[in-house]
Amino acid sequence: MNPTAEQIQKINHFSKVNIDMCAKIASVVDIKECEPKEQLLTEGDTGDTMVLVFQGQVEVSKNMMVKTASGFTTSRKPIIRLETTDPRPSRDPETESTVFIVEAPAFGIGEFSLVLDNAIRTAHVNATTPLKYGILGLEDFTRIVKDHPEIGGAVYFEVAKSAVNNLATASGDISNLTQAFFFALTR
């Protein structure tokens, strides 16, 4: 079963695309379902698909190096949770959130895969509730954009905004870490 054009348009990356063009995108996306704890994306993997979440909640996490008594080890740190509002998840998450929950009617993750072949996944994404989602592949999206170039401008602009926001956040994080490192060295 395919999502509706209206479901596609709820996702911020497609919100500026007219409804007829959203129908073209919907035609190449199949709705899938999964249970909590299913991993949708793995940090460090490469991919050419974007995940479109229509109902449910996911947790985004990153690998972090942690110092232990025996040296360093990798630990997974939750960064944020994303949750749909239209409709809300079918049930509460299995685990309580320890991070901020961002709500949106629907949302997309892995959007850089609509721009780059083999885009590197920058975080882990796991379902925390039952999920209804779809997969939009780069090949299908590229074919739609070639046939309907007006879609590309609106979507690529939203992806570029996302990249700029991520870069600004990363820059601030690097600055804070650098200051903390120098502070630790002077103690």
Predicted regions and their residues:
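Cyclic nucleotide-binding regulatory module and flanking cytosolic helices
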Residues: 1-36
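Cyclic-nucleotide recognition modules
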Residues: 7-10, 75-156
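Short beta-strand segments in beta-sandwich/barrel cores
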Residues: 30, 39, 57-62, 87, ...
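Short phosphate-coordinating micro-motif centered on Lys-Gly-acidic
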Residues: 40-45
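Short, conserved beta-strand element in jelly-roll/cupin
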Residues: 51-57
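Cytochrome P450 core scaffold surrounding the K-helix E-X-X-R motif
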Residues: 61-70
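Polybasic "coupling" helices that flank or enter modular domains
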Residues: 126-128, 150-187
